[in-house]
């Protein structure tokens, strides 16, 4: 039986995820001038919002689908589809976030992919894309044998947690980079901790807290989905009745 601590953790996780997105929106709206889709700096402001929403919050939530007790009984297929759909939604938000930053850079003739933040971020997105397509092909389509799925499942689980960790690192480095670029004049330098810096740093801490809670729920052995019985060697997952 799953204890009330699990549901309390889920409630806390939902609150933290909502705060991560809302804090990022407020930062971009209040201190950075709001949003647009015209190649200006206001178009860039979509980038942090969409990356936090996609690569952290939606991705983290999608990773926990199989921790829900409701997914432990009855057909497994609906939960597989939900898991894949939430990750796909996270990926779409991420791609739109990348379009926003690349369009802004190209419009202002700023170099792309030169900073450590950008290298880390684009690597994370590449791994996410590989993870999603591999998971879809192996764990959802009916062609893969049980042997192949058993071989790849630990790798899939490892990269799921690794990608979330890399996403958090990308967000934190991105917040820092944005503050260094924006708060560099003599009236409000970053090192003097103006209100924007305090708020943005707090947003980063919320992202870290969200990520750590996701990892805690993922790693808690008592909250993992019980292993099903032995399946036939080539039972297609699109037709399973687990």
UniProtKB/Swiss-Prot annotation:
Positions in the Lumenal compartment: 29-45, 105-119, 176-202
Needed co-factor(s): heme b
Cleaved signal peptide residues: none
A Pfam family per the record: Cytochrom_B561
Glycan attachment sites: 38
GO BP term, pick one: intracellular iron ion homeostasis
Catalytic activity from the UniProt record: Fe(3+)(out) + L-ascorbate(in) = monodehydro-L-ascorbate radical(in) + Fe(2+)(out) + H(+)
Single annotated GO MF: oxidoreductase activity
Residues the record lists as binding heme b 1: 47, 112-115, 117, 177
Membrane-spanning ranges: 8-28, 46-66, 84-104, 120-140, 155-175, 203-223
Keyword Nucleotidyltransferase carried by entry: no
A GO cellular-component term linked to this record: intracellular membrane-bounded organelle
Its job: Transmembrane reductase that uses ascorbate as an electron donor in the cytoplasm and transfers electrons across membranes to reduce iron cations Fe(3+) into Fe(2+) in the lumen of the late endosome and lysosome. Reduced iron can then be extruded from the late endosome and lysosome to the cytoplasm by divalent metal-specific transporters. It is therefore most probably involved in endosomal and lysosomal cellular iron homeostasis.
Name assigned to this protein: Lysosomal membrane ascorbate-dependent ferrireductase CYB561A3
Species this chain originates from: Homo sapiens
Gene: CYB561A3
